[in-house]
Structures are given as C-alpha cells and as structure tokens.
Amino acid sequence: MARFIVLFLIFLNFSFANSLGLTKTDLVILNKIKSLADEPIMKYSLMAIAIKESSVGKNMANFSSNDFGLFQSNIKTVLSRQYIKDTPQNRKYYALKLMNNVGFATANAIIELEYWREVHKDNWIKIWSSYNTGFSYRSDTGYLYAKSILEITKKLKQEYGL
C-alpha cells in the first residue's frame, strides 16, 4: 500500500509540475524571449503570449487571421507600426520575418504591448485583452484572453521558476 501511495504522489507531482506541457526546447525559447525584455512584467507577458498564441513556436502562421510568428502578430498591424506600405510583397516578406526572426517578432510584440500600455495606463489586464481584441478589450473574449495570460504567468513563476 505504501508503494502505491508513493507512486501516486510521484505521478501527481509530475502531472502538476508541467501543467503547461512545455518541452526543454520550449524552455530554451522562453528564456531567450525573457532575455529580450527589461521589465519583469514585459518578460512574463511575452513568454505567456508566446505560449498562448503559438504554443512557443509550434503554430507560427494563421492565414485566416493573417497573424504570424511566436506572438501571432497581425501582419497589417506590423506593417503599420513599422511604417511599411501594405503590399502583397511586403506582407509576405514581413510574415516570413516574423516567423524566422525571434528578435524581430519580439520587438514587434513589445511595440504592440507598449502601445496598449500607453492607452490603458499600465492596466495589464486591459493591455493583454487589447493585445488580442484591440479596442474591444471589454469583450468576454478579451477578458478570457487576459485571464489566461495571467494564469500562464503565474504558472511560469511557480512551476517553472522562470
């Protein structure tokens, strides 16, 4: 009986120790993302968004919404924030750049978060919500997105020590 309890506790500990299902490669990528930002809130926001949006790079392209890269940045928004003309050639070039250049993808995610940070005066729930829904941040979709980002950041701190 004692053997069963020990095995059960080990299994229970293992199943909760990686509740986000992150691999060693995912952790390397997350540490790289973390190194590209200065503020802790920005570091955790970026890591959580990468997990939520692309499963840390496993889903880099969403052609139905035109979102690309680790952070699923919308191509029209990226072109606008980079002051680049919206043409099919530029969309393709920058979509590929978002998918292949972690630094570029991270810089664009930071630009987007900083834009919403200014709009929402450091209210991170609204910032995360707007990252996903724009000015529809009061929507259920936005709220649930922000809530999931908060939960992921908690798990990154508590379970993974990131």
Stretches with model-predicted labels:
Residues F4-F14:
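Sec-dependent N-terminal signal peptides
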Residues N18-L162:
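Catalytic glycan-binding domains that act on GlcNAc-containing polysaccharides
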